[in-house]
Amino acid sequence: ISDANVATVTGSTTTIVGAGTTSVTVSQAADDNYNSATATMTLTVSQADITTATVASISDQTYTGSAITISPTVTFNGSTVTETTDYTVSFANNTNAGTASLTITGTGNFTGTKTVSFTIVKAAPTISFNDVSKTYGEVDFNLSATSSSTGVFSYTISDANVATVTGSTTTIVGAGTTSVTVTQAADTNYNSATATMTLTVSQADITTATVASISGQTYTGSAITISPTVTFNG
């Protein structure tokens, strides 16, 4: 066989090595009545259909925000074949959570295409929700969490004696410490998740309160006590 990249021969047993065309020469020794002689034929080995190859199952992939690429394990007749040499790989719908596809296209000894699917699962979002310190008497404020997800936030406060929340608007009720939990709904690419921070409300300084003017008192011979009118923030 003239091209060992196409086939090899041992005795008369021929082993196919790769797709292509080669000449095969047979030489026959002389006998009592005939001279020695040769003859040549052409051996053509066609490319194999890549659809008959096996692509190993692809495990679920987690959403990253970027296109996900995988080097698949491909076998043909029980032997592993090599990317670039035997096939190329392309992808579709391989960024967002859902069903993505991988297509192998035969090269070299293979022809045709084969497509398999794999799943991109939602990721856990990264939520930033920092502790907050306030002083009793401060005006309402908005809770503000940030996240890699676009899911809607909802907030709960564990101790209504410290603060209450409507939507994200938080009203201070009294001095103390409470935990605040944010829950974020799932979106297209992220699962739902929660995060917790601590809200600390310090006591207000009574010197900022207003004591109403006290009218003159008349001597009684006894200690005079008064219940003052004290206002804070109006």
Regions found by a protein language model. Give the residues of each.
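Solvent-exposed beta-strand/loop surfaces, strongest in extracytoplasmic domains of secreted
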Residues: I1-G234
